[in-house]
Amino acid sequence: MRGSDTFTESLFSIKKLDDFVPASHPLRAIRVMVNDALTNLEDLFARMYEDAAKGGRPSIAPQKLLRAMLLQVLYSVRSERLLMEQVQYNLLFRWFIGLSMEDSVWVPTVFSKNRQRLIEHDAVVAFFNEVLAQAENKDWLSKEQFSVDGTLIQAWASHKSFVRKDEPGDGEDAQAGGEDFRGQPRSNDTHESKSDPDSRLYRKGKTASELRFMGHTLMDNRNGLIVNAKVTQADGHAERDAALSMVSDARQINPEATITLGADKGYDAKEFVPSAGRSPSAQSAR
């Protein structure tokens, strides 16, 4: 017998958010590790809000902020506005963050403002280090064998915001301007973005020139876990400089170890290989 296409919503429900999350879902194991790390950050969170202890409107709980930010990374949600939109209807996201089905979702601007407090107090770095400490306690890290890589991060700024440094006007005016920049000589020495002054006009390989930053990661090869990360301005030396800095950090943690480093051909430069400490062992990738 053919079923009918009807929809009847119950006035009451006895379902819990946990009932909608499969027992084998990877976020279950991740959430346990996340909550253990957040518990160890309680003293930091208390210091962050000492100036607001006398009263005022309650902020977003820092634990919920960090869980939401982690979801944004894991699921590649490109903006806070889209993240809040997904939290509104995604029961998995609500469960992971710690919001009930009845809880209101935060306004994106409020979320961004509260997130800034985390950044100012290095809470994100402390959270990363707490998770890394769990991996170390479980002997998931070799502390000797690493790989390094970098990637381009596009800035939230348009080409029209990239104007001469001595040109007046803010980012909105610059982006709204109708001037055609094509064919004009532009460089980071003479120009900057009025929307994001820290970004740099940069191209790599066959890619087009864009306003960008560079992200860098150091991975422990035993289980493929990221043990260090940096974001820098984009230039031709940033990848190698960041790699040397992260390898130096690894040496300080384990000074007696013989550290090996894997990298692609972009790091095969005479200013990098000798500085890394040993002669290279090259192997062609198939």
Where are each of the predicted segments found?
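Basic, low-complexity intrinsically disordered segments
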Residues: 2-5, 20, 32-140, 155
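N-proximal short alpha-helices
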Residues: 3, 7, 56, 84, ...
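Polybasic low-complexity intrinsically disordered regions
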Residues: 88, 97-286
